[in-house]
């Protein structure tokens, strides 16, 4: 939990905030004590790649700092396309109950991962690209979007993706306008807004979807097909979604940053994409707002954390919760909140966890045989 000091206008501390903080800490004590004792690490088959070097706005390149005014204080909300797409992808994985862990350029151990998602990582080093190639060559699945790997960290570029051989597509040097659509047989048309996306041609990848653009420039005041929107018009034939086999693995390339949009149609597209290419989803009857995290301690203990994370407090309790977790035969299960044992129920190589009621949070310690 994170609290900022609560100070009244007269300079005194707001005692009710600290009373609330104390109640939260006391309620979390069984869980924090278990984590301190076990010191587990995230258990996941999916990796989400975050490129700090790519968190830039190329449109501001060359603008003197004295002229750069974002119009916001240090407490304001800023927009960063890459961070927005990574966080939206993380939300989608959480909604789908797909455990994941964050990867960066400093993460050398990719063991245990079956799929890695790279969101619009424009600036990648040769070492990062080599690690991604090796991952796919050895049987992994890479999902890359947008401008990923177009330039090295110093900005140098050949004009094509560094990972063009892995993607199976080539960058044409051209971009869409700020509105474009992905056209696929399954989803029809899915919009990407407020971003110019690269136009690419298939080299030797399988074409899963193409790029459709409006008939006229976005938001043109004189030429338009609709006065209040930019509807799809021309199917360009450029590759929008592709699948490329590489070594023993495969690479999915998505031309746009539509995963950053948190609207229903874009989320539905992302869910279909991840269900097809990202393994490790847990079966449960939990709503999208609930989170499930898997952790593994050094002694082999599996820790399952379930959080009822509704947007508007207080949480509405969830009843008759069921979760299925693929795992080896289990010796015992203990509920962390009260330390009581839980009956072990296995079915088809999966552990079945049941909760009669989930208010806010619960954890389980699972000892495997």
Where are these regions (language model features)?
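Carbohydrate-binding surfaces of carbohydrate-active enzymes
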Residues: 1-369
């Amino acid at each position: 939990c994170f609290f900022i000091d609560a100070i009244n206008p007269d300079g005194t501390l707001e005692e009710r905030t600290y009373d609330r903080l104390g109640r939260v800490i006391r309620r979390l004590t069984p869980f924090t004590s278990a984590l301190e004792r076990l010191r587990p690490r995230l258990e996941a088959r999916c990796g989400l790649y975050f490129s700090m070097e790519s968190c830039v706005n190329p449109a501001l390149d060359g603008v003197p700092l004295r002229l750069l005014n974002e119009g916001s204080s240090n407490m304001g909300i800023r927009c960063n396309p890459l961070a927005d797409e990574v966080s939206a992808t993380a939300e989608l994985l959480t909604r789908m109950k797909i455990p994941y862990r964050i990867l960066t350029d400093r993460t050398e151990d990719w063991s245990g991962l079956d799929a890695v998602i790279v969101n619009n990582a424009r600036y990648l080093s040769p070492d990062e690209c080599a690690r991604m190639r090796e991952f796919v060559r050895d049987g992994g699945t890479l999902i890359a979007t947008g401008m990923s790997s177009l330039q090295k960290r110093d900005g140098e570029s050949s004009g094509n993706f560094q990972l063009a051989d892995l993607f199976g597509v080539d960058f044409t040097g051209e971009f869409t306008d700020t509105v474009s659509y992905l056209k696929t047989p399954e989803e029809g048309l899915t919009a990407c807004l407020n971003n110019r996306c690269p136009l690419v041609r298939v080299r030797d990848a399988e074409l899963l979807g193409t790029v459709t653009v409006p008939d006229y420039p976005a938001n043109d005041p004189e030429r338009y097909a609709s006065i209040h929107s930019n509807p799809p018009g021309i199917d360009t034939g450029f590759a929008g979604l592709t699948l490329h086999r590489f070594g023993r693995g495969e690479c999915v390339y998505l031309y746009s940053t539509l995963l950053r949009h948190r609207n229903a149609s874009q989320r539905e597209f992302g869910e279909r994409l991840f269900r097809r290419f990202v393994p490790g989803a847990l079966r449960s009857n939990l709503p999208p707002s609930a989170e499930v995290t898997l952790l593994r301690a050094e002694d082999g203990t599996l820790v399952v954390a379930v959080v009822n994370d509704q947007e508007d407090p207080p949480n509405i309790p969830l009843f008759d919760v069921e979760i299925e977790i693929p795992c080896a035969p289990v010796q015992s299960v203990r509920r962390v909140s009260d330390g009581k044992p839980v009956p072990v129920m296995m079915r088809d190589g999966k552990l079945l966890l049941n909760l009669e009621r989930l208010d806010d949070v619960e954890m389980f310690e699972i000892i495997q045989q």
